[in-house]
């Protein structure tokens, strides 16, 4: 377990020049890019992917902010081995600015922890949600990457964060229930003009992941008019379970494990993506972020 105190992070408030950060052999785009990891169903490995993806992005010196977007009952701090002194509830209650809640995680990433057991934070009201997204947009521009772990399901706060992000990553497993819930999530995102990238977790073979993605894309194309592109498959790997039990992310604890290799490949692909979808804080005004979520 790491130092339980929240460690102040020196973050300059001066405007930053666009810069490049090496990610493997790739050149990363302008600083301030954002990724939201979303799933329709709990238990598919979403938080684990968010944590390990953030650490993979930080491997070569990129400045990374990891946000626990499940404000009422998140677990990012647990998977990072942290016991933070503050969490997002201090900001939402008006006790400190958003940057004042940050803690230092593995590899020096900044972690914005969630509250634990605050049911009143499970769904934020519209003014609070607007303030949060504005402040998060300002904070994210001080980092090369912001990775947001969203709550499972299709609540208004989680969907607003998914639409806010430049790159929504939709995680599922081959389980039929997980696929059904992932499709419902893709449908809600499509209603706001967003097509997520698809990642299939816990596959036995790469061919299984490709087949899951093919069937998902066929259904989405027919009903939604747009198909999520497959951006990666993650194998069922005992290293992931052992690392979670030890509160030690698998890209750190088992860097050569197959699942760690695949997550680093996903990080590399994110760094070389030349066609981001754009977002509210990095591509113009998006008033639709604050509209009610349409019915599934």
Map each language-model feature to its residues.
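NTP-binding/hydrolysis catalytic cores, primarily Walker-type P-loop NTPases
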Residues: 247-296
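Conserved C-terminal guanine-recognition region of P-loop GTPase G domains, centered on the G4
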Residues: 179-193
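G-domain G4 guanine-recognition motif of GTPases
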Residues: 40, 173-174, 196-211, 233-240, ...
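Hydrophobic positions on the alpha1 helix immediately C-terminal to the Walker A/P-loop
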Residues: 49
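Extreme N-terminal, non-catalytic leader segments
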Residues: 1-44, 55, 62, 96-100
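P-loop/Walker-type NTP enzyme "switch/lid" segment
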Residues: 39, 66-141, 238-249
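Inter-motif core of Ras-like GTPase G domains
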Residues: 138-141, 155-176
